[in-house]
Amino acid sequence: MSFRERLEQTIAQNHSLLCIGLDPDLERFPTGIPRDPEGIVVFNRAIIEATADLVCAYKPNLAFYLQYGAAGIAALATTRQLIPPHIPVILDAKLGDIASTSAAYARAVFETLGFDALTVHPYLGSEALEPFLSTSDRGVFVLVRTSNPGASEIQDLPVGEAGEPLYLWLAERARAWNQRSGNVGLVVGATYPVDLALVRQRCPDLPILAPGIGAQGGDLERAVCAGLTEATAPLLVTVSRSILYADASARFAESARAAARRVRDTIERIRKEVAGQAGHR
């Protein structure tokens, strides 16, 4: 089964476009959770058990584990094993290097650690991405329009004869790569709903991973409308801190579940409204 098929199967099973980011911040851990790599496993286990029926995917960010060295990587590997096998897990690592190095990264992420997908940056061109694109059962999400405030410094630069912004040009390139490999998605920040809509118009058939809802200030309704209108592929709405740290008490997992359910249900309501509007055109 391809990565895309597995993703869509989980979306249908859980009626969810919610992707929870597993980004542990020890300083924000609830009462009773050790503030060390072992505590990361305890915390993540509780979050996963509380939300596994509400998500379409999980997305751990490599940096939040790598900062603790070997013990942090061990916590990441254990976290991967804790997630039910039918739920896709995307490693947010933003990788990309010369071909031989990317091949080593691909083996580490897909084979050694067993992740289903990862995020990559396209700055080195298609040669650097080839090792990630070569297997249809693993997903590759290409950074196109990131959610951070400084994204426009580079991503809005005009390119080509038409002078279109770089992020749109990259989206077109990623779509071309997908025609060959079938496993490409895009990363487009929910903090830029106008740009998200433009990317979706160009790439209706590519999955989009949309970070930035919650702590980064993205508007959920605008982002979901932008990412689903004219779409034939999923929009994965990524939320991390506002779910993980919804409560600092011993009932943190229960509160995380409630927060995740609210987001999941809101997305589902908007999705149905968008689908209804499309049906009346």
Swiss-Prot record:
<dbReference type="GO" id="GO:0004590">
    <property type="term" value="F:orotidine-5'-phosphate decarboxylase activity"/>
</dbReference>
<dbReference type="InterPro" id="IPR011060">
    <property type="entry name" value="RibuloseP-bd_barrel"/>
</dbReference>
<dbReference type="GO" id="GO:0006207">
    <property type="term" value="P:'de novo' pyrimidine nucleobase biosynthetic process"/>
</dbReference>
<keyword id="KW-0665">Pyrimidine biosynthesis</keyword>
<dbReference type="InterPro" id="IPR011995">
    <property type="entry name" value="OMPdecase_type-2"/>
</dbReference>
<comment type="similarity">
    <text>Belongs to the OMP decarboxylase family. Type 2 subfamily.</text>
</comment>
<dbReference type="GO" id="GO:0044205">
    <property type="term" value="P:'de novo' UMP biosynthetic process"/>
</dbReference>
<protein>
    <recommendedName>
        <fullName>Orotidine 5'-phosphate decarboxylase</fullName>
        <ecNumber>4.1.1.23</ecNumber>
    </recommendedName>
</protein>
<dbReference type="InterPro" id="IPR001754">
    <property type="entry name" value="OMPdeCOase_dom"/>
</dbReference>
<comment type="pathway">
    <text>Pyrimidine metabolism; UMP biosynthesis via de novo pathway; UMP from orotate: step 2/2.</text>
</comment>
<dbReference type="Pfam" id="PF00215">
    <property type="entry name" value="OMPdecase"/>
</dbReference>
<feature type="active site" description="Proton donor">
    <location>
        <position position="94"/>
    </location>
</feature>
<keyword id="KW-0456">Lyase</keyword>
<dbReference type="InterPro" id="IPR013785">
    <property type="entry name" value="Aldolase_TIM"/>
</dbReference>
<keyword id="KW-0210">Decarboxylase</keyword>
